[in-house]
Structures are given as structure tokens and as C-alpha cells.
UniProtKB/Swiss-Prot annotation:
Belongs to the ketopantoate reductase family. The gene is panE. This is 2-dehydropantoate 2-reductase. PANTHER family: 2-DEHYDROPANTOATE 2-REDUCTASE, 2-DEHYDROPANTOATE 2-REDUCTASE-RELATED. It is found in: Cytoplasm. Pathway: Cofactor biosynthesis; (R)-pantothenate biosynthesis; (R)-pantoate from 3-methyl-2-oxobutanoate: step 2/2. One of its GO terms (molecular function) is 2-dehydropantoate 2-reductase activity. NADP(+) binds at G7, C8, G9, A10, L11, G12, N98, A122, E256. The lineage of its organism: Bacteria, Pseudomonadati, Pseudomonadota, Gammaproteobacteria, Enterobacterales. The keyword Oxidoreductase applies.
């Protein structure tokens, strides 16, 4: 399959290496155009992938059968709109990022839109990406008109298992959002690995109660207890991980808070729900961001 991977960070390189190893025809797409992108990855089994792959080739993009987007949430809309005019109108666009809200920004895109949530863990160590832990990628149609692309899940299952197709992906996206609303802001504010959150069950419960109320209003059945149990499972299984938001804060980069807690706050307002704990955490992360963005280091760059 001919695939363009938009974004060549940790997640992008994980997909590029896996697709390449399994015989797919792939290219990367970088914000600053370059003819090649270096992919240096150590997999969970210790094997090493080190290759320069084609990048930013518009002719390749014009023949691509899939655009796999692994950017930060706040980069997605501008980048996808830029590339959509060259991508075949029948080729699906699969968004894999933390948070929600990008689909609402891309309603006018003609290509089929799919969205996904991933639990694989990968991190950068210098110039090398380390695939820390295997996980599952959940994918499904982003809009009602986007149809059944379950064959893609089968193809990607053979590349980077596990991959699960959901006819209604939004329920799974909300579950992932609940996890992100707990783990990302708390670890970013407390500067700790995920496992440290085990000692803060009251805080986790307060966040999950608010998220559960919003999810119920969105039309998906859940409970605060169910969400807490799920979040605590994720905390245990990723105890040594440094969350993506904490990595961003440590590197003084723009975070995805607007698409995680920020998205929850938007939907809560629509439903007339008060979410004071999530509001407080949102403001604290935004304040931390503004401290280093004022100095110019972490300003979000245009795509």
C-alpha cells in the first residue's frame, strides 16, 4: 500500500518503520520540507531500524492510498488542509493524536476521515526513538458519511498489532480522553511519571466524576467508577512512562491541553455542566505554558 505519514516524531517514526518493514511503500512528510526523513528506532524486542525514507514528495502524495497523521493535535488542521488538495479524494485520512476536536475543524475535507486512539508508548532519546511498550490502535469513521474502512484495520494489524476497528469510534475516543484528562495535566503539573498518580485517588475521582457526567450527556453510557477503574489500569500499566504533556512541558513546547481538557470544557459548556476540577487544571497548565511561551521558546509554530 502507498502511504504518506504526516509527522515524523516518535509516533510517526514508529509507524514509518513498521510499515517499511512489512513491505509498504511509504514516505514521511515534515513541517520543514526535506527530501528525506531519518527514521532511527529501537523496537520493544531490541531490534534496530535505521533508514532514510523519502519525504515531502508531492507526486508520491498524489498517489497515496492513505494519509496517516501523527502530529500534535494543535498542528493537525492546518497541515491536513494543506495536503488534502493534493491527496486523491478517495484516499482516507487517519488522524492519530491525543485529545479530540480536530474533526470539528476539518468538516469541509472531502476525503474519508478516520480517527484513532493509540496505547503504544514511544519516546525520543536524543536522535533515537525507543518503542517502550506495545499497545492497541483503535480506529473508526470520524463522521457519519465516512463509511466502513475496516479493511485498513486488517492491513495495519499486520504492521503494528493490535489494531481494532470500531463502527462507533467516539465512545473509545471519550474513554481515551478521560485517561488523558487525568494523566496529562497532573503529571505535567507535578513533574512525575505516571505511576506517582496512584497516590492521588481523590484527585482522580474528582476528574473522572466530571468527565463521566459530560460523556453521559454526549450519549455514551459510562460511570465515574468505570472511568476511575480504567484510568487506574492505565496508570499501573504505564507506571514508568513520562506522559506526552510532561515531555512537552520539560522541553518548553506547546502542549495539547486545548484538545484534551479544553475539549472537555467546550462540551461541558454546551451541556450546561460545571467541571470545576478540570477547569482548574486547564488554567494551571495554560499558566505554565504561558510562562515559557512568553520567552519565545515554546510558541506554537505554524505548520
Amino acid at each position: 500500500m502507498k502511504i504518506t505519514v504526516l509527522g515524523c516524531g516518535a509516533l510517526g517514526q514508529l509507524w514509518l518503520s513498521a510499515l517499511c518493514k512489512h513491505g509498504h511503500d511509504v514516505q514521511g512528510w515534515l513541517r520543514v520540507p526535506q527530501p528525506y526523513c531519518s527514521v532511527n528506532l529501537i523496537d520493544t524486542d531490541g531490534s534496530f531500524f535505521n533508514e532514510s525514507l523519502t519525504a515531502n514528495d508531492p507526486d508520491f502524495l498524489a498517489k497515496s492510498e492513505l494519509l496517516l497523521v501523527t502530529l500534535k493535535a494543535w498542528q493537525v488542521s492546518d497541515a491536513v488542509r494543506t495536503l488534502a488538495s493534493t491527496l486523491p479524494v478517495t484516499s482516507p485520512i487517519l488522524l492519530i493524536h491525543n485529545g479530540m476536536g480536530t474533526i470539528e475543524e476539518l468538516q469541509s475535507i472531502q476525503q474519508p476521515m478516520l480517527m484513532g486512539a493509540i496505547t503504544h508508548a514511544a519516546r525520543r532519546d536524543g536522535n533515537i526513538i525507543i518503542h517502550v511498550a506495545n499497545g492497541t490502535t483503535h480506529i473508526g469513521p470520524a463522521r457519519e458519511q465516512d463509511g466502513d474502512y475496516s479493511y485498513l484495520a486488517e492491513i495495519l494489524q499486520g504492521v503494528l498489532p493490535d489494531v481494532a476497528w470500531h463502527n462507533n469510534i467516539r465512545a473509545e475516543m471519550w474513554r481515551k480522553l478521560a485517561v488523558n484528562c487525568v494523566i496529562n495535566p497532573l503529571t505535567a503539573l507535578w513533574n512525575c511519571p505516571n505511576g506517582e498518580l496512584r497516590h492521588h485517588t481523590d484527585e482522580i475521582n474528582a476528574i473522572c466524576e466530571e468527565v463521566a457526567a459530560v460523556i453521559e450527556r454526549e450519549g455514551y453510557h459510562t460511570s465515574a467508577d468505570d472511568l476511575c477503574y480504567y484510568v487506574e489500569q492505565v496508570i499501573d500499566s504505564t507506571a514508568e512512562n513520562i506522559s506526552s504533556m510532561l515531555q512537552d512541558v520539560r522541553a518548553m513546547r506547546h502542549t495539547e491541553i486545548d484538545y484534551i481538557t479544553g475539549y472537555l470544557l467546550k462540551r461541558a459548556r454546551v451541556h450546561g455542566l460545571a467541571v470545576p476540577e478540570n477547569s482548574r487544571l486547564f488554567e494551571m497548565v495554560k499558566r505554565k505554558e504561558s510562562e515559557y511561551e512568553r520567552s519565545g521558546t515554546g510558541m506554537p509554530r505554524p505548520w
